[in-house]
């Protein structure tokens, strides 16, 4: 006994992908609240943790990073086991 497959393309309509809206330069505005704090290159990040720490200290010394407010947060841990 053999199997016979027949595909009817007329019955299966592929849904067209929604068109993505093209963005041009006129649709992009100027940055807001931008503060330039440091130059970081790929070599800086791969040179070790001392360099990363140095970059973090440099950025914090520029200001704008100490404005956080303390908050008490309570979270409940739920242990889920696959079974």
From Swiss-Prot:
Q: What's a Pfam family in this record?
A: PBD
Q: Identify the GO cellular component terms for this protein.
A: cell projection; cytoplasm; cytoskeleton; phagocytic cup; plasma membrane
Question: Which positions anchor the lipid (S-palmitoyl cysteine)?
Answer: 10-11
Q: Which residues carry this modification: Phosphoserine?
A: 42, 51
- What's an example Gene Ontology biological process for this entry? regulation of signal transduction
Limits of the CRIB domain: 28-41
Q: How does it sit in the membrane?
A: Lipid-anchor
The cellular location(s) given in this protein's UniProt record come to: Cytoplasm, Cytoskeleton; Cell membrane; Cell projection, Phagocytic cup
Note the InterPro entries from the entry. CRIB_dom, CRIB_dom_sf, SPEC
Q: What Gene Ontology molecular function terms does this protein carry?
A: signaling adaptor activity; small GTPase binding
Major location category of this protein: cytoplasm
Domain remarks in the Swiss-Prot or TrEMBL record: The CRIB domain mediates interaction with CDC42.
Q: How does it assemble?
A: Interacts with CDC42 (in GTP-bound form). Interacts weakly with RAC1 and not at all with RHOA.
Q: What does this protein do, in the record's words?
A: Probably involved in the organization of the actin cytoskeleton by acting downstream of CDC42, inducing actin filament assembly. Alters CDC42-induced cell shape changes. In activated T-cells, may play a role in CDC42-mediated F-actin accumulation at the immunological synapse. May play a role in early contractile events in phagocytosis in macrophages.
Q: Which PANTHER family match?
A: CDC42 SMALL EFFECTOR PROTEIN 2 (PTHR13502:SF4), CDC42 SMALL EFFECTOR PROTEIN HOMOLOG (PTHR13502)
Q: Which family does it belong to?
A: Belongs to the CDC42SE/SPEC family.
Q: Tell me the protein's name.
A: CDC42 small effector protein 2
Write the gene name: Cdc42se2
